Amino acid sequence: IEDYQELKKTIDAHRTLGHKIVCTVGSWDMLHIGHLRYLIKSREYGDVLVVGTDSDRGIKLYKKNNLRPIIPQEERMEMLKYQECVDYVTLIDDIDDSGKWQYELIKLIRPDTFITTVESYSEEQMKDIKQYSNEVIVLPRQAQYTSSTKIIEGTVKKHIEALLSEMIKKG
């Protein structure tokens, strides 16, 4: 659901039914096992899981990297909506020029629980997030060896090494 007002109405209906609302936000670039474990774990904290997906523009700003994301926002959102543990997916694009999230999603839906990881937000941002959520849960990394950055860097490194090897062979 891309329209926040429509999402709010839907979440309000769930609340009327007594459902506990859980929210998490991420880039979800190069979806991998760590992401999936994290989403499954997040869903365990409530009845409805709302997943915010950072826009392409936002990722470029906060990662300070024009090469990211690898996967366009529409495709990342589509992959997330196919995950059984995810109830709603929405786009996050309220990121200021310094790359800081402005919290519009959680200001509007006021989740019972917001799930994050240690490295996702500064202490100042965590204080802000706590204002708009009844509870904030910080999960550890869900994959010891896998991250989008490691996948990208590992793949690029292998390709560069192979190209260099070919160039050396050709003289």
Q: PLM features: residue spans?
A:
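Nucleotidyltransferase catalytic core that binds NTPs
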Residues: 1-171
